[in-house]
Each structure stands twice: as structure tokens, then as C-alpha cells.
Amino acid sequence: MDSNCIQFLHDKTILVTGVPGFLAKVFVEKILRIQPKVKKLFLLLRAADNESAMQRFHSEVLEKDLFRVLKNALGDENLKAFITEKVVPIPGDISVDNLGVKGSDLLQHMWNEIDIIVNVAATTNFDERYDVGLSVNTFGPLNVLNFAKKCVKGQLLLHVSTAYVRGEKSGLLHEKTFHMGETLNGHRKLVIETEMELMKQKLKELQKQNCSEEEISQSMKDLGMSRAKLHGWPNTYVFTKSMGEMLLGNYRENLPIVIIRPTMITSTFSEPFPGWIEGLRTIDSVIVAYGKGRLKCFLADPNSVLDLIPVDMVANAMVTAAAIHAGKLGSQTVYHVGSSCKNPITFEQIHDLAASYFTKNPLVRRDGSSILVSKGTILSTMAQFSFYMTLRYKLPLQMLRLIYVIYPWWNGNKYKDIDRKIKLAMRLVDLYRPYVLFKGIFDDTNTEKLRLKRKEINKEMYGLFEFDPKSIDWEDYMTTIHIPGLITYVLKK
């Protein structure tokens, strides 16, 4: 199947949205590196015009260290010619009709040429503004679907979602599709059009009240979180992504749909080289804060499984699934791409590995001194965490407030600063709580069948499209690949 995957990409024209996002970049690099005879890659990215799109592609995609293997293989001049021939950055936006592509000639050309549509575009903020989440994560996929239906040669729409659309349930969480109007708590029926109307009505009220942009933004965030929790989802991100899946399933007609649901995506495992990453994602924020000596206590169940998966494994699963399902009219298949079912790692294990790493390899302050870390305190319930915060911070804060009241001429900046930090910490804990106290295991039966199909057909090239989590040695990966990658590419040290 590996050779079949490479052959599948031969002479294909592929539209990829969500560029220059982390996963989209890795997916694009993979295709260009393994199949130089791909016909064309249309890359949709937000930009004012063609020139801006090209500039953004070069600065935010091609110039990244991710592409160094391709650069070394081709050389600067050949790479430039190769990219000019194969890659077309397109200014656009999935939240509008026809993906915001301007020019009837260009649109017609794309509809005539595109074989595969890959939608990676999303807003991933857990507490995103509800208007933004709905336009990008919910109705964005519907716009991509409508665009894909106009593609004369269209063989497949591959949509990247997230495994956490399954909510906060415990036990084995299956790779099942959503039905239109389904909720996670079953209390009431979800009507997506009603959600859109509620959002628009609230926005209109806020504007009529002459609210500031900051007030509008916060109100939209609060609305998204409240609507999500009303229907059983922990946050706006997974709620709006779930509704996006519902729309795809309901309006797909005969177009083959593949939904890839990754878990927490981490740095590259092996391709194009180990350890490349961009930005702090979920657990990485905790690891970096710990390494900087800022994390003395954290809310987490030590025995909770954190489902991590390297980004190159997700990209490999995407290519393999596309090769398997292209042209299979009417099919809709969900794939969980994660590790909790086949090779789980717990929060306590990650904590211990991070402690071991930073003890042996401490980060260095600007003055050259080493940051010494000690094992932090892990509290497994919100009640324990709130009690700790009260003793450690809130009571001293009340003392500062009392001083401020008694002596109003005293500089109260310290009180305000600590108060702001505590509120921020509690908000972050509330956002991350569903993930660090997670009790579910993501079933990957469909994904395992995909792996077996690939392995049976072409054993000698099995490693080229690796996405088997059993191949990961977590201790080796975390201490020699992932954490060093965070330090190199995120902290830039």
C-alpha cells in the first residue's frame, strides 16, 4: 500500500485548506517529498491577494526548517523551479462561498482540475468566539463540501476534525459518525440553524448597546462555552467541530467523505526528521512551564491517559486513507488517529519524563544561571486544586487587598497583578480540565484496519507511511525527540 499511496498521488491535483497551519504544512511537505510527480497543489490561505498569498506561503511554509530535507535533496534553484511548477497559493477563506476564491476563470480551472480536497482549516481555540467558531469550524466544512461537489473530477473530501468531539465520556469511544441534531447529553435536539440565529441575535444586541470590541469578544466567547455545555460538549472548539461533521454527513450526497480525528498532535516522530514542531499545543504548555520552573502545582489525574500522536503519523494516515477511499461513492468513514488504545501514556509518566529531562538538561536564564526544577504537586480533583489555590494565593491576595483598602495611597499594582494572574490560571485550568482529567480511550478499529491493509499489500515499504503508535517508545520519544524539539523550535534555544 505504501507504493500504492505514492502511485495514487501521481498526476493528482489536490486542494489543501488550512495552510500555513502545523498539520497542513507537514502534509504538504510529505506529498512534495515522496511524490514529485504530483500534478498540482492548490493551497488555500488567508491573504489579501495573490502576491500576499505567495509571500505568506514562502515566509510561513517554505522557509521553515521542516522543508530542509527537500531543500538539501533538490538544491535552491531546483526547489524554486519545482515549487513554481507544482504549488499554487490561493488567497481564500473557508467561511465564505466558493472559499473566497476570486476570479471566475480561476474557479472554473480549479473545479475542472481538482481530484482530492483536504480540509485542515480550523480555529482551535478552546474558548473561541462563537461567531468565529461557527463560521470556520461549523459552516466552513459545508462551504468546502459545496466547493468539492463542483469539482468535475472530485474523488474524495478528506476532513480533519478532532477525536475530542466525542466529549468527556469514559470508556471506549468508538469511531462513529454524528447524526444531524445529535447531542452528547441527549437532553434536547440540536438545531444548527438555531445556534446561528442565537449568535447573530446576541451580536446584534451587543452592537446596539455600543459595547466595546473587548466586551463583544468576551460575550461571544461566553456564549459559545454556554451553548457547548448546554448540549454536552466541554468547550466551543469541539462543539463547533462536531456540528461541522454533522453538516458534512447530512449534505454529502455521493461524494466520498473521510473524517480524520487526531488526538493531541505532537512533534514529528521521524519524517522528514524527528522533533520538528511549531507552537505550543495542549500538553506542551505544561511541559514548557514546568521546565521554566513556573509550574509548582497542576490539576490532573496522574493515571489519566493523555492521547498523544506525532504529526507525521497523522499526515501518513491522511494520505493512506485518501488512497483507500478515493472514488468510493457514498462512503463516509471516521478514523481516530491516536495512541490511547494501542500504546497509552499517562500524565504521571509524562510528568516524570519531563522532570527527568529538565533535571539533567536544565533551561538557562538570561543571566546564564540554570533553572532548577523539582517535582510539582499533581492534584487530581478540582476541589483539591481550588483548596490549594486558596491557601497558596487567594488568602495572601486578600491580605494585600485589605492593605490596599486601609492604606489607599499604597501602590496596589502588586495586588492587581496577582489577581489577574490567578484569574488567568483558573480560566486555563477550566479550559484544560476536560483533557487532563479525561477518562476515555479512543477506539481505533477502523484505523487499525487501515494499517493492516497497508502492511499486507507492501511490507518492504511499510515504514514510509508509518502511523502505528505501537512503534513509539515514549521515554525515548519524549526525552530525545519531543522535548528537545520544543526547546529548539518553540523556545528557540
From Swiss-Prot:
Expressed in the endodermal cell layer surrounding the central vasculature in roots. Expressed in the hilum region of seeds. Expressed in stamen filaments and receptacle of siliques. GO terms for biological process: lipid metabolic process; response to salt stress; response to wounding; suberin biosynthetic process. Signal peptide: none annotated. Pfam families: NAD_binding_4, Sterile. InterPro entries: FAR, FAR_C, Far_NAD-bd, NAD(P)-bd_dom_sf. GO terms for molecular function: alcohol-forming long-chain fatty acyl-CoA reductase activity; alcohol-forming very long-chain fatty acyl-CoA reductase activity; long-chain-fatty-acyl-CoA reductase activity. Its EC number is 1.2.1.84. Catalyzes the reduction of fatty acyl-CoA to fatty alcohols. Catalyzes specifically the formation of C18:0 and C20:0 fatty alcohols. Provides the fatty alcohols required for synthesis of suberin in roots, seed coat and wound-induced leaf tissue. Provides the fatty alcohols required for synthesis of alkyl hydroxycinnamates in root waxes. Belongs to the fatty acyl-CoA reductase family. This is Probable fatty acyl-CoA reductase 4. It comes from Arabidopsis thaliana (Mouse-ear cress). The gene is FAR4.
